[in-house]
């Protein structure tokens, strides 16, 4: 029984570790703006385009939570926006 509980907890932790968060990028590598977007846009965008669990407008850019590890999100150190 203890082994089963440990297995389930370990399996749940894998999901937490493999999920990440961050800003989605547009085609130029810039943060995806939500400045003039309707309410709920970022959540829909994150879920449909990045398979994220949720998202919101962290004015002025969308921010996504629960992004799968294989999806790219904006990174300060590898920023290619406007270059």
Curated annotation (Swiss-Prot):
Disulfide bonds: 30-81, 34-57, 42-62, 46-64
Modified residues (Cysteine amide): 81
Tissue specificity note: Expressed by the venom gland.
Annotated family: Belongs to the long (4 C-C) scorpion toxin superfamily. Sodium channel inhibitor family. Beta subfamily.
Major subcellular location class: secreted
Subcellular location as annotated: Secreted
Leader sequence segment: 1-19
Keyword Methyltransferase: no
Domain of life: Eukaryota
InterPro entries referenced in this protein's UniProt entry, alphabetically: LCN-type_CS_alpha_beta_dom, Scorpion_toxin-like, Scorpion_toxin-like_sf, Scorpion_toxinL, Scorpion_toxinL/defensin
Domain free text: Has the structural arrangement of an alpha-helix connected to antiparallel beta-sheets by disulfide bonds (CS-alpha/beta).
Biological role: Beta toxins bind voltage-independently at site-4 of sodium channels (Nav) and shift the voltage of activation toward more negative potentials thereby affecting sodium channel activation and promoting spontaneous and repetitive firing.
GO biological process: defense response
Identification of the protein by name: Toxin To12
Residue ranges of every copy of the LCN-type CS-alpha/beta domain listed in the record: 20-82
UniProt keyword terms in alphabetical order: Amidation, Disulfide bond, Ion channel impairing toxin, Neurotoxin, Secreted, Signal, Toxin, Voltage-gated sodium channel impairing toxin
GO terms, molecular function: sodium channel inhibitor activity; toxin activity
KW Nuclease (keyword) present: no
Cellular component terms (Gene Ontology): extracellular region
